[in-house]
């Protein structure tokens, strides 16, 4: 997974 910043929420993946 990747770290994407969408809209006003920061979604972090790849845990």
UniProtKB/Swiss-Prot annotation:
Positions carrying Tyrosine amide: 15
Domain of life: Eukaryota
Tissue occurrence: Brain.
Keywords (A to Z) from UniProt: Amidation
Protein name: Scotophobin
Organism: Rattus norvegicus
